[in-house]
Regions:
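C-terminal low-complexity, charged extensions that often adopt amphipathic alpha-helices
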Residues: 73-112, 216-221
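N-terminal leader/targeting segments and the immediate start of mature chains
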Residues: 1-24, 88, 212-221
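Gly/Pro-enriched, hydrophobic low-complexity segments
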Residues: 110-214
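Edge/loop elements at the starts and ends of beta-strands within beta-rich repeat scaffolds
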Residues: 5-13, 24-25, 32-37, 139-141, ...
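Extended beta-sheet lipid-handling architectures
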Residues: 13-17, 26, 43, 55-57, ...
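Hydrophobic lipid-interacting interfaces of membrane-associated proteins
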Residues: 18-22, 46-49, 166, 181-183
Length: 221
């Protein structure tokens, strides 16, 4: 019923002039997402580009100035489960927490307080069982939270939307809190200028060539 009641959702969403706080240290960013697989998030500080996380129809990538060695890691989508990519650097996960994807192919659902909990059973990149839960706010008719639990039912990472923009009768994220429990890392997204169904520049989906590239398949540090 939730999916049928939703307004017609956009094929793309973009945010400009965002502030990203990582353990209270802030950077600026722009985020663009065009279904099904085009994604780009570039974060900058006064020292220049800090992170570049992206995806196109064929491959995904991430680069961080703070990682040593500072490679641009990439792989094809079909090999995602064969890589050691951690959740916070996974464009697929970031697309999900923006809240404009259809909710489908889930294993079960139930109501929890004012939320509809949608449950997915999956395996991570190490072939360990994980459980993904999305909480849908039935009053606002939109995504509230996204949670991943390990095989011991311990919460690994969560993303909760605490404030929304109302655009074209649809609630989209304005503020997202991400808690990566494994690394004791808290990230806050304060999302700025939002646009739905905007024609996004195709150059956004091109992997940058100005960094040394390493395929995640077979890579070990």
């Amino acid at each position: 019923n939730y999916q049928k009641q939703r307004p017609t959702i956009s094929n793309s969403i973009s945010y400009n002039n965002n502030k990203i706080y990582v353990n209270n240290i802030s950077v600026k960013s722009n985020i663009s997402y065009e279904k099904p697989l085009n994604f780009r998030m570039i974060s900058k500080s006064i020292l220049g580009v800090e992170n570049d996380i992206g995806s196109n129809k064929n491959e995904f990538w991430f680069w961080s100035k703070r990682m040593k060695p500072s490679y641009l890691f990439y792989s094809n989508h079909e090999n995602l489960k064969k890589t050691r990519l951690r959740t916070p650097f996974n464009p697929h996960w970031m697309m999900q927490i923006l809240g404009i994807n259809e909710v489908k192919n889930f294993n079960k659902s139930f109501y929890y307080k004012n939320y509809l909990a949608v449950v997915f059973y999956d395996k991570n990149n190490y072939n360990k069982k994980i459980t993904k839960i999305q909480l849908i706010d039935t009053d606002k008719n939109c995504l509230y939270g996204h949670y991943i639990f390990n095989e011991f039912d311990e919460l690994i990472i969560s993303a909760e939307i605490t404030d929304y923009y109302s655009v074209n009768e649809f609630n989209v994220p304005k503020t997202i809190f991400i808690n990566w429990f494994e690394e004791n890392l808290i990230v806050k997204w304060e999302l700025g200028d939002v646009a739905l169904n905007k024609n996004l520049d195709n150059s956004l989906w091109i992997m940058p060539n100005n960094y040394e590239k390493v395929n995640l398949i077979g890579y070990s540090d």
